[in-house]
């Protein structure tokens, strides 16, 4: 039986969709056995602890996040490794990545069709998926002749709430605000409510991932860009299966593309008249 070690949390809708696709492939081509080591395991035991576990369990492949550049998993274990992008794309392992710039362009085009002239971005500083979503958004805003504003930080929400509040109040209105993901869009929604800034009349809000729980906690619910994550999970299963069977050599990139903007029943991006 093929054994897959998952260095993935289940807390985000992105991860759950990814795993649904992976599990679907395993059901069609298995049986496979999965074991999840959550993020706190690394905090408690370090990367060497993960490496020890993988060796003792005799894992056939690893999928997830790995931020230690000093340990070469493939050299140590000689098994397929697929990493989720965070700070940067790996040059050593296969990547689960995305068309991040394309996602940013889609957001700008969505707002441009609604006749916005002011465009803002809120995201995480220094992580590839947020940096490139910002860049794609900024490039498209420049192309269409809009005004661009951004706020990017690597600090925790509580550390920047006051600064973000001031930034939101100073933005020219109405403004189209694209956030790097739904969690950050929810933070913006909460901050707007605390400061009596009206969504969507003053700020139209758009997130990424279509995390239904995150989006619907907000009032009004948040519109969001849907990604083909389940398809990506299925593709990971197929490619690592080929590698395990020695049918595919070398590393590969699984690119998750944006597919649509989910607005049904959500009011954070009403049509402008």
Label each PLM-derived region with a short phrase.
Residues 1-61, 70-272:
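Bacterial carbohydrate/catabolite-sensing allosteric modules
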């Amino acid at each position: 039986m093929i054994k897959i070690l998952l260095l993935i949390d289940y807390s985000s809708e992105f991860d759950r969709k990814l795993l649904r696709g992976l599990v679907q492939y395993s059901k069609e081509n298995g049986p496979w056995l999965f074991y999840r080591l959550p993020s706190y395991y690394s905090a408690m035991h370090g990367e060497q602890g993960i490496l020890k576990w993988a060796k003792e369990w005799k894992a056939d492949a690893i999928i997830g996040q790995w931020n230690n550049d000093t340990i070469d998993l493939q050299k140590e274990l000689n098994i397929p490794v697929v990493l989720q992008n965070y700070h940067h794309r790996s040059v050593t392992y296969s990547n689960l990545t995305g068309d991040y710039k394309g996602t940013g362009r889609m957001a700008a085009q969505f707002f441009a069709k609604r006749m916005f002239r002011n465009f803002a971005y809120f995201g995480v500083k220094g992580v590839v998926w947020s940096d490139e979503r910002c860049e794609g958004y900024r490039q498209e805003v420049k192309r269409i002749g809009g005004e661009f504003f951004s706020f990017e930080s690597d600090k925790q929400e509580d550390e920047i709430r006051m600064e973000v509040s001031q930034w939101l109040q100073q933005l020219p209105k109405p403004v189209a605000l694209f956030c790097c993901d739904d969690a950050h869009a929810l933070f913006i929604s909460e901050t707007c409510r605390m400061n009596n800034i009206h969504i969507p009349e003053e700020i139209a809000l758009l997130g990424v991932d279509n995390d239904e729980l995150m989006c619907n906690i907000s009032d009004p619910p948040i519109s969001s860009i849907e990604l083909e994550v389940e398809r990506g999970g299925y593709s990971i299963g197929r490619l690592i299966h080929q590698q395990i069977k020695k049918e595919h050599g070398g590393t590969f990139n699984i690119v998750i593309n944006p597919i649509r903007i989910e607005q049904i029943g959500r009011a954070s991006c009403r049509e402008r008249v």
